[in-house]
From Swiss-Prot:
It is a multi-pass membrane protein. It is found in: Membrane. It comes from Xenopus tropicalis. The keyword Transit peptide does not apply. The gene is duoxa1. This is Dual oxidase maturation factor 1.
Length: 308
């Protein structure tokens, strides 16, 4: 009888669905995009569609840079295995064990096949943050005290500071620099949008190029961890292997897109300045400014003649 008694959570817990920070970023971007679309009819001429493309493209780049800092699917892996459910128990269950690695920590999932087994609903998602070594070990000890399932604790143990695998040192360092460089990319994204709204297009193009380079360097920093010896996570004959996730590939595509756009704009700036003026809606404004300057010069000349 004692073998079937397991520790439970003090109250029912809801499994992870969506990260609220990601939802907030998506809502902010959608509201901002809708705002610009509403004021779109007030823009005259051929520059309307170009202006809309600029706004949506810039919002997409900024949203990706900001969102991937909080996602947990930079590197993912899932394995299906039959394993022990709880420590010091002989009860076995068939489940899918998932490992989701992000810049802020890891998420370890356990989903039963089927979900309802051993008189329980087997659907767990536990987050272990690595803001510091003490924080990760504290989360691991809390998991031990709460009686988390054995597969979750087994995977989390591989990332503890004292584990011989050394995964914590590898991932903590690489994700730290990846996150910091990605925040630099976000700052340069804000800066190039400000510069594009001013008559200093070349500086805006340069900052857009810097944004792309920062994103790519951040990806290289994260990918460097895979060059280290891999500590395999075994569940019987099954092995939990990881691969780059959606956030990594999305960041790569966005970084390359930003790089290509900046190089194209730089080429047009050097060879086709009229096209650049059209893209950034500077042509009409410069004509008006030239016209106003001529009118002021003409009026000042007339007043000078009257005085003479």
């Amino acid at each position: 009888m004692q073998a079937n008694i397991f520790p439970f959570y003090p109250q029912p817990r809801t499994s992870f669905k969506f990260d609220t920070k990601i939802i907030e970023i998506i809502i902010i971007c959608i509201v901002t995009a809708c705002t610009f679309i509403i004021i779109l009819p007030g823009i005259r001429g051929k520059s309307r569609s170009i202006w809309l493309f600029r706004i949506l493209t810039s919002l997409f780049i900024g949203a990706v840079i900001l969102a991937v800092n909080f996602t947990s699917d930079w590197e993912t892996g899932i394995v299906t295995a039959t394993t022990v459910y709880k420590s010091f128990s002989h009860s076995m269950l068939n489940a899918s064990i998932g490992l989701w690695i992000g810049l802020k920590g890891v998420n370890i999932t356990l989903i039963g096949n089927p979900v309802y087994q051993l008189n329980e609903t087997i659907n767990y998602n536990e987050e272990f943050a690595w803001e510091s070594a003490n924080q990760f070990d504290k989360n691991y000890k809390d998991g031990l005290e709460r009686g988390l399932p054995y597969p979750i604790l087994y995977v989390a143990e591989k990332f503890t500071i004292n584990s011989p695998c050394g995964l914590f040192q590898q991932y903590c360092i690489s994700t730290y620099y990846s996150s910091e460089i990605m925040w630099v990319a976000f700052g340069s994204w804000i800066l190039y949008n400000v510069l594009f709204s001013m008559p200093v297009i070349l500086y805006g193009i340069c900052m857009m190029f810097v944004t792309a380079i920062c994103m790519l360097v951040s990806l290289i920093s994260f990918a460097s961890v895979r060059q280290a010896p891999v500590c395999n996570i075994h569940f019987g004959n099954a092995v939990l292997k990881t691969h780059f996730g959606v956030s990594y590939w999305l960041s790569l595509v966005t970084g390359l897109f930003c790089l290509i756009v900046s190089l194209v704009l730089l080429f047009l700036y050097k060879t086709q300045p009229k096209v650049i003026r059209l893209i950034f809606s500077y042509g009409e404004e410069e004509d008006l400014s030239d016209k106003s300057e001529n009118e002021e010069e003409h009026s000042s000349a007339l007043s000078l003649n009257e005085m003479l």
